[in-house]
């Protein structure tokens, strides 16, 4: 057989786990009973063979002991490297001071939390439909009819009261200006439209 690698189950007298441990009589004789049987594990090793090799029979004890010492450390290193690569690829490259100084394209802008930077919010009175259910009392019966929303004037959206339509999270300087009173009056009377 010419194969580059194969997996073999090693259950011989030379291996640390012998078939004698699998017998019920042996476990009962030791006194462990079921607890001893639960500690039994099978051992499977992968051995790479060249075309010249004659199989598992020629593997000496010294070579297997060498493999036992080197294989777990190399597997641990591989697992650590694999975990580190996965973590780095999931989180992305770190944003340091140099990245901030070079370009700010990767950094998101701070936006208003109320409107998410759009400058407009959905009217809370009509739910964004622009229609409002009004009660019409004519004669003996009451009738509900849909009219224009008195809060948003039928538009369904209002100017954000937190950022005043700018979309920015901090506009305290805007409110200190003398023309801010006129701006607020227009906004509350519905004369300022969202996105205008």
From Swiss-Prot:
Gene3D superfamilies, sorted: Heat shock protein DnaJ, cysteine-rich domain
CXXCXGXG motif repeats: 112-119, 123-130, 149-156, 160-167
Gene Ontology CC annotation, any one: thylakoid lumen
Phenotype upon gene inactivation: Slight pale green leaf phenotype.
Residue ranges covered by zinc fingers (CR-type): 96-172
Single biological process term from Gene Ontology: photosystem I assembly
A molecular function GO annotation: protein-disulfide reductase [NAD(P)H] activity
Chief location of this protein within or outside the cell: plastid
InterPro entries per UniProt: HSP_DnaJ_Cys-rich_dom_sf
Location(s) in or outside the cell: Plastid, Chloroplast thylakoid lumen
Keywords, sorted A to Z: Chloroplast, Metal-binding, Plastid, Repeat, Thylakoid, Transit peptide, Zinc, Zinc-finger
Coiled-coil residue spans: none
Function according to Swiss-Prot or TrEMBL: Nuclear genome-encoded factor required for the accumulation of photosystem I (PSI) during plant development. May form a complex with PSAG and mediate thiol transactions in the thylakoid lumen that are important for the assembly of PSI. Possesses protein-disulfide reductase activity in vitro.
Protein name: Protein PHOTOSYSTEM I ASSEMBLY 2, chloroplastic
């Amino acid at each position: 057989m010419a194969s580059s690698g194969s997996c073999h189950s090693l259950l011989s007298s030379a291996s640390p786990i012998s078939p004698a441990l699998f017998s019920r009589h042996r476990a009962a004789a030791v006194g462990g009973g079921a607890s001893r049987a639960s500690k039994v594990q099978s051992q499977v090793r992968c051995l790479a063979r060249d075309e010249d090799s004659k199989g598992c029979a020629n593997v000496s004890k010294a070579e297997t002991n060498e493999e036992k010492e080197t294989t777990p450390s190399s597997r641990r290193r591989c697992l650590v490297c694999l975990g580190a690569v996965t973590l780095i690829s999931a989180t992305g490259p770190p944003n340091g001071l140099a990245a901030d100084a070079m370009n700010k394209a990767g950094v998101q802008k701070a936006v208003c939390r109320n409107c998410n930077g759009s400058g407009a919010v959905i009217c809370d009175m009509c739910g964004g439909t622009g229609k409002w259910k009004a009660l019409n009392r004519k004669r003996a019966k009451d009738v509900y009819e849909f009219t224009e929303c008195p809060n948003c004037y039928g538009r369904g959206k209002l100017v954000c009261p937190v950022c005043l339509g700018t979309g920015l999270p901090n506009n305290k300087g805007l409110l200190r200006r003398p023309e801010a009173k006129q701006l607020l009056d227009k906004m509350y009377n519905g004369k300022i439209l969202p996105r205008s």
